[in-house]
Amino acid sequence: MNIEIINPSEDQYGNRKENIFLAFGDAGNYLGSAYTYPTINYHQTYETPYLIFVAIHMADDMDKVLSDEVMQMLFDKMFARANEIRMQNPDLKARIYAGFEQDKDKLDFYIKNGFEEDYSIIMDADIPHNFTYMLPESVNVEELKLDSDQEFMKYKLLYDEIFVTPLDGNAYTEQSQQKYFKNLSFIVDDKLVGGCTIFEKDGFGYVETVYVLPEQRGKGLSKIIVNYIFNYFLSNGINKTRLEVWELNKCAVELYKSFFYNEVEKNLMFPVITL
């Protein structure tokens, strides 16, 4: 089979078309896709601030031999582009990395292609039954409802600037269907300063995200948000909480430890090449 890999005709989901690769077979049938996406993030990974995310998605129900061939071809195109992107900021230490992958075969694929192991940490904490918290009068909390594509894209642009893994629309939709789901914005003087997404999963109050805008950091807002989250969970009868954080995000790890989160497990989640 002849395999053709092309760029899309236009930018997609806030990413440049040159960073996206689509694979098709002889009959024009879709075989898979890959993309790379750069961001500069001094807050989460200050030692390697230039982050270049890569991802591969294969079509369903493909023959394994064909799937392996297409995946390698997509990887080669994507990785070459990631290295081109890296050279756009040669003065910064960079990481080319894959995101959260539950597929062990795909994780092994990245390792086989020269990526090194990197880990996320699962952390749990108990919320004391007598825990109470009053939000400061200067802080308002608003629920963010993404009822249109335009609203989702606005949120995605914000999310992708803050977090090391771009927002996945399907994953967000799945989370939004969980019990007690909230996407919250924290407002001071009518301006967004931070936010979080939370829900109940497997009996835990799950903290998917906590963020503070770069210009608002150092003011204790992260602790305000986490305290608010604890109070929200406890008000809904949930007294234990769980989250997952990149091991390299030392600021976040220390924040959660200050709330008595303890490490319970490590996952190979971010295969990486440091340049």
Please place each PLM-identified region on the residue numbering:
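C-terminal "cap" of GNAT-fold acetyltransferases
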Residues: 121-147, 244-250, 260-262, 267-275
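Conserved hydrophobic beta-strand within the GNAT/NAT acetyltransferase core sheet
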Residues: 96-98, 207, 241-245
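A short beta-loop-alpha structural element at the N-terminal edge
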Residues: 2-13, 39, 140-155
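Flexible, substrate/cofactor-facing loop regions flanked by secondary structure
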Residues: 134-205
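Acyl-donor-binding surface of acyltransferase catalytic domains
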Residues: 58-137, 270-273
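Conserved donor-binding loop and adjoining core beta-sheet/short helix segment
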Residues: 7-82, 193-205, 213
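Conserved acetyl-CoA-binding loop-helix of GNAT-fold acetyltransferases
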Residues: 66-84, 212, 218-235, 253-258
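A structural microfeature
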Residues: 32, 114, 119, 192-194, ...
